[in-house]
Swiss-Prot record:
InterPro entries: Cyt_c-like_dom, Cyt_c-like_dom_sf, Cytochrome_c4-like, Cytochrome_c_Oxidase_Subunit. Acts as an electron acceptor for the thiosulfate dehydrogenase TsdA. It comes from the Bacteria. Heme c 1 binds at residues 41, 44-45. Keywords: Heme, Iron, Metal-binding, Repeat, Signal. Heme c 2 binds at residues 141, 144-145. This is Thiosulfate dehydrogenase electron acceptor. The keyword tRNA processing does not apply. Residues 1-22 form the signal peptide. Residues 23-108, 118-210 form the Cytochrome c domain. One of its GO terms (cellular component) is periplasmic space. Pfam families: Cytochrom_C (PF00034).
Amino acid sequence: MKSIHWPLAGVAALLLSMQAQAADGQKIYTQGGANPAAMACATCHGADAMGMAAAGFPRLAGIDAGYSRKQLDDFRSGARSNPIMQPIAAALSDEEMDAVAATLEAMPAPDFAAIGRSEAAEGVGARLALRGAWERNIPECVACHGPAGMGVGASFPPLAGQSAQYLGAQLNAWRQGTRKNDPNDLMGHIARAMSDDEVQAVAEYFANVGQKETGQ
């Protein structure tokens, strides 16, 4: 019996070891996944996962793991279109997605002072962010994304501190239908009701809120 049990135990230990390696979220982030097509996240999002604003790569650090996991799934399925992320997500296993999403949530993220609907709203971007435009069925951004757009759980990601280029690109993707991974097309309806100038203004508002509060 020993001659049977020991080999089986060895195989089991090897499998567990392989799974542990595959589930090393930090390694996936900095070096890439088991599939060579799953390139290291840090290449575009930075070693600290704070993103690269000039290139339009968003901050990932501190974002809820459930949200990040869903985005990876959506890139893989095509519900969220991006020529860089789609092949990377397709090359990641479910286990690798879980691991890297958990790693991202644990990474340090900037803090932002709570800015809500009671604050003064000066300018187009601030008015949309804090008051909305209900006559056009545009709710204020902070109603869902939280004070200062800090993000709320797995459903509403942080807006504060993301680059204006990234935020504007996402709003335009919803307007154009290339991003369609929100429940009941909520963001699609909102984005399509906004003008080009409003998209730019609200994107710059949240980008600047982040810079002001983090001292950048």
